[in-house]
Amino acid sequence: MIRRMEEHDLVRVSALIQNTLLVSNSSDYDLEIVGNLITAFSPSQLRAIAKKRRIFICEENGAVLGTIGLEDNRVYNFFVAPDRQGSGVGRELLEFVENRARKEGWEKLSVASSLTAVAFYRKMGYVRKGEQDNETYGRTVTMERRL
Protein backbone atom coordinates (compact mmCIF):
# COMPACT_ATOMS: atom_id res chain seq x y z
CA MET A 1 0.00 0.00 0.00
CA ILE A 2 1.29 3.46 -0.88
CA ARG A 3 0.34 6.35 1.36
CA ARG A 4 1.59 9.73 2.51
CA MET A 5 4.32 9.60 5.15
CA GLU A 6 3.13 10.68 8.59
CA GLU A 7 4.94 11.90 11.70
CA HIS A 8 4.96 8.44 13.29
CA ASP A 9 6.77 7.05 10.20
CA LEU A 10 9.83 9.32 10.46
CA VAL A 11 12.09 6.94 12.40
CA ARG A 12 11.24 3.93 10.20
CA VAL A 13 11.65 5.88 6.95
CA SER A 14 14.96 7.35 8.13
CA ALA A 15 16.20 3.86 9.05
CA LEU A 16 15.17 2.51 5.63
CA ILE A 17 17.03 5.33 3.85
CA GLN A 18 20.13 4.93 6.01
CA ASN A 19 20.24 1.17 5.45
CA THR A 20 19.75 1.58 1.70
CA LEU A 21 22.56 4.12 1.52
CA LEU A 22 24.91 1.77 3.39
CA VAL A 23 23.98 -1.40 1.51
CA SER A 24 23.12 -0.22 -2.00
CA ASN A 25 24.79 3.14 -2.57
CA SER A 26 28.12 2.58 -0.83
CA SER A 27 29.49 0.81 -3.91
CA ASP A 28 29.09 4.05 -5.93
CA TYR A 29 29.96 6.65 -3.28
CA ASP A 30 32.74 6.91 -0.72
CA LEU A 31 31.95 6.61 2.98
CA GLU A 32 32.21 10.35 3.58
CA ILE A 33 29.47 11.03 1.00
CA VAL A 34 27.31 8.19 2.38
CA GLY A 35 27.78 9.62 5.89
CA ASN A 36 26.71 13.08 4.70
CA LEU A 37 23.61 11.59 3.10
CA ILE A 38 22.76 9.59 6.22
CA THR A 39 22.89 12.82 8.25
CA ALA A 40 20.71 14.56 5.65
CA PHE A 41 17.97 11.95 6.14
CA SER A 42 17.74 11.85 9.93
CA PRO A 43 14.18 11.86 11.34
CA SER A 44 14.41 15.59 12.14
CA GLN A 45 15.70 16.39 8.64
CA LEU A 46 12.92 14.29 7.09
CA ARG A 47 10.38 16.24 9.13
CA ALA A 48 11.74 19.48 7.64
CA ILE A 49 11.80 18.01 4.12
CA ALA A 50 8.17 16.89 4.46
CA LYS A 51 7.12 20.49 5.04
CA LYS A 52 8.11 21.43 1.49
CA ARG A 53 7.46 18.25 -0.49
CA ARG A 54 5.12 15.30 -0.37
CA ILE A 55 6.75 12.10 0.83
CA PHE A 56 5.07 8.76 0.22
CA ILE A 57 5.85 5.31 1.55
CA CYS A 58 5.13 1.81 0.34
CA GLU A 59 4.18 -0.30 3.32
CA GLU A 60 3.41 -3.99 3.74
CA ASN A 61 2.40 -5.61 7.03
CA GLY A 62 3.71 -2.60 8.94
CA ALA A 63 7.13 -2.64 7.25
CA VAL A 64 8.28 0.32 5.14
CA LEU A 65 9.52 -1.13 1.84
CA GLY A 66 10.28 2.11 0.06
CA THR A 67 9.82 5.87 0.00
CA ILE A 68 9.62 8.59 -2.64
CA GLY A 69 9.18 12.35 -2.61
CA LEU A 70 7.44 14.61 -5.10
CA GLU A 71 7.75 18.39 -5.35
CA ASP A 72 6.20 19.98 -8.42
CA ASN A 73 7.51 17.84 -11.29
CA ARG A 74 10.64 16.52 -9.54
CA VAL A 75 11.24 13.20 -7.82
CA TYR A 76 13.22 13.30 -4.58
CA ASN A 77 14.21 10.99 -1.74
CA PHE A 78 13.53 7.74 -3.63
CA PHE A 79 14.77 4.67 -1.77
CA VAL A 80 13.75 1.00 -1.76
CA ALA A 81 14.83 -1.45 0.94
CA PRO A 82 17.82 -3.43 -0.38
CA ASP A 83 16.05 -6.77 0.09
CA ARG A 84 13.08 -5.51 -1.97
CA GLN A 85 15.01 -4.01 -4.88
CA GLY A 86 14.04 -5.79 -8.08
CA SER A 87 10.68 -6.89 -6.64
CA GLY A 88 8.51 -4.17 -8.23
CA VAL A 89 8.35 -1.84 -5.21
CA GLY A 90 10.40 0.85 -6.97
CA ARG A 91 8.31 0.61 -10.12
CA GLU A 92 5.11 0.89 -8.07
CA LEU A 93 6.35 3.98 -6.20
CA LEU A 94 7.63 5.73 -9.31
CA GLU A 95 4.45 5.03 -11.29
CA PHE A 96 2.45 6.35 -8.32
CA VAL A 97 4.17 9.76 -8.40
CA GLU A 98 4.18 9.84 -12.22
CA ASN A 99 0.40 9.44 -12.15
CA ARG A 100 0.10 12.19 -9.52
CA ALA A 101 2.26 14.55 -11.55
CA ARG A 102 0.28 13.77 -14.72
CA LYS A 103 -3.03 14.51 -12.93
CA GLU A 104 -1.56 17.80 -11.71
CA GLY A 105 -0.85 18.81 -15.32
CA TRP A 106 2.90 18.26 -15.51
CA GLU A 107 4.20 17.12 -18.90
CA LYS A 108 7.50 15.71 -17.68
CA LEU A 109 9.11 14.45 -14.50
CA SER A 110 12.77 14.90 -13.62
CA VAL A 111 15.12 13.50 -11.01
CA ALA A 112 18.70 13.99 -9.85
CA SER A 113 19.48 10.27 -9.81
CA SER A 114 22.18 8.66 -7.74
CA LEU A 115 24.74 6.76 -9.79
CA THR A 116 23.26 3.63 -8.24
CA ALA A 117 19.78 4.23 -9.70
CA VAL A 118 20.59 5.36 -13.27
CA ALA A 119 19.92 1.91 -14.80
CA PHE A 120 16.56 1.70 -13.00
CA TYR A 121 15.43 5.08 -14.31
CA ARG A 122 16.60 4.22 -17.82
CA LYS A 123 14.52 1.03 -17.66
CA MET A 124 11.55 3.16 -16.60
CA GLY A 125 11.89 5.38 -19.68
CA TYR A 126 13.96 8.24 -18.27
CA VAL A 127 16.58 9.94 -20.43
CA ARG A 128 19.90 11.28 -19.18
CA LYS A 129 20.14 15.09 -19.42
CA GLY A 130 23.37 15.87 -17.57
CA GLU A 131 25.48 15.36 -14.45
CA GLN A 132 26.24 17.39 -11.36
CA ASP A 133 29.00 17.06 -8.80
CA ASN A 134 28.26 18.10 -5.25
CA GLU A 135 31.11 18.11 -2.77
CA THR A 136 28.81 17.11 0.10
CA TYR A 137 26.42 14.67 -1.59
CA GLY A 138 28.42 13.34 -4.54
CA ARG A 139 27.69 12.99 -8.24
CA THR A 140 24.13 12.80 -9.54
CA VAL A 141 22.71 12.32 -13.02
CA THR A 142 19.79 14.48 -14.13
CA MET A 143 17.19 12.34 -15.89
CA GLU A 144 13.71 13.11 -17.16
CA ARG A 145 10.71 11.46 -18.72
CA ARG A 146 7.77 12.86 -20.64
CA LEU A 147 4.50 11.88 -19.00
Where in the sequence are the language-model features?
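A short, internal acetyl-CoA/4′-phosphopantetheine-binding micro-motif in the GNAT/acyltransferase core
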Residues: F78-Q85
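Conserved catalytic-core motifs of GNAT/GCN5-like acyltransferases
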Residues: S110-A112, V127-T142
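A conserved beta-strand-loop-helix scaffold within acyl/acetyltransferase catalytic domains
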Residues: I68-N73
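Conserved GNAT acetyl-CoA-binding A-motif
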Residues: A101-S114
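Conserved beta-hairpin
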Residues: R53-G66
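Conserved acetyl-CoA-binding loop-helix of GNAT-fold acetyltransferases
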Residues: G86-N99, K123
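Conserved GNAT-fold acetyl-CoA-binding loop/helix
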Residues: Q18-S44
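A short beta-loop-alpha structural element at the N-terminal edge
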Residues: M1-A15
